Amino acid sequence: MLGATSMRVHDVTLTLRPGMPTWPGEDGPRVEPLKRMARGDSSNVSVVTFGDHTGTHVDPPVHFLEGGATIDQLPLEPLVGRCRVLGYGDDDHISGHWLDGAGIGMGTERVLFKTRNSERWRDPRAPFDQEFIALDETAAHWLVRAGVKLVGVDYLSVEPFGSGKLGHPVHVALLRAGVVIVEGLDLHDVAPGDYELFCGPLKIAGGTGSPARVLLRQR
């Protein structure tokens, strides 16, 4: 029997690096030297530049709701606690009908979706894939009705590419209900099941989002 100190911890965070996939129209991260001991400085210091929706990141309400809470105003409770990782093998987007039979138990507050998207993260320089699997609007409303407080997905958006033409209905439905959205998870090495989630976005004043370190501890 595993003791608490020997439980495996999975890091499901994408590594921030130049050249990584980003949302179309958004710049990738840059890491530039500010000080280097090799050139006579007393320490090594870098300047890191990235958008606040780069890599594994958290969407606060203000991302799509004018006047909504910013990243530094998010409640902490949804970011830490028990979560369910659901495996999804279909090629269609995740629907409320599928969730009816997914076995999400009463009281489940955090749900992460592992789809074929996670396999793309094995290649850190794979180009952006517009055909990623996401949630449709019926799934968003299902999760809200079920009382879920945090939803995580394994690509760079919780809703299908091109949904901006429709007003981003999945984001809006979740964020209006106070559901925290975590995007860009790398779940390729994580089996479906129950875990403890630890999600730490940066505390950026007025931030419209933030990269986050996300860990799962095996239960």
Name each region found by the language model.
Residues 1-219:
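Active-/binding-site microenvironments in catalytic and ligand-binding cores
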